[in-house]
Every structure is written in C-alpha cells, then in structure tokens.
C-alpha cells in the first residue's frame, strides 16, 4: 500500500466521503473492482483550457493546457514517492455534446470528469466558488463545458 494512503483505506470511505491524500482533500465518487474514482475537493488552480489558439482542435482535451498541468501534478506526486500504480489508468470518452466522436477515447491516470460523469455524481461533488473544466467538448469548435461550482 502506498505510504500516502496508509491511514486511509478507500474501501472504508463511502461515496461522497472526504479523505486526505497527497497533502490534499478528495471526495470519493465511486468504486469498482479496479479502484476508486475520486475528485479534488477544492480547485487546485485557475487557468484557461488552453492559453492561445488552436484552430484545428480548439476544444480537444488531449491538446489542452489543463491536461499538461495535470500531467505535471502526476509527475510531482510520483517524484515525491507516490507509486505510479496508485493512479489507475482510466478511459475518458471525448464524445461531444452533440454526439460526435472525432476526439475519440483517451486514457489518463489523472483527468477531468465528463459531462455525463458530472450529471451522475453532481450530488456528491462539493460546491466551490468558481467554475471548473469538464473533459467533454461542446459540439461547436470553440468551447468546452464548465461546471459552475454553486450547483
């Protein structure tokens, strides 16, 4: 077991429960035989989805600054001694809000919720005072959805 989770067994944390790991607070959203889906309890940073224009794929999560940031967070966690296998790879379906599938399905160890996941878990997600990004691209080429923290 990872030293960062030695005091918390996620199987004992109920869905919607808050736990501390990696020096941060998280909420457990769900679990299955592979592991747990968790979400940061608070906003870690404020940033644009992408800094600058990408006319070919303006709302593509794979090319976003948000995912670069989260990749750096993962690197920091592992550099500080957290085993990489603590972060179980999971698939994110990048189907847009109109049903188009040109962005495909990607796999990450740390990522964003999709619009469907937000709809499924919104009752468990703590309220925050600022909007936050979702992985699901809009059907238009200009935007990605935001979740407004007030509900």
Annotate each predicted stretch with a short phrase:
Residues 2-151:
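Collagenous Gly-X-Y triple-helix signature in extracellular proteins
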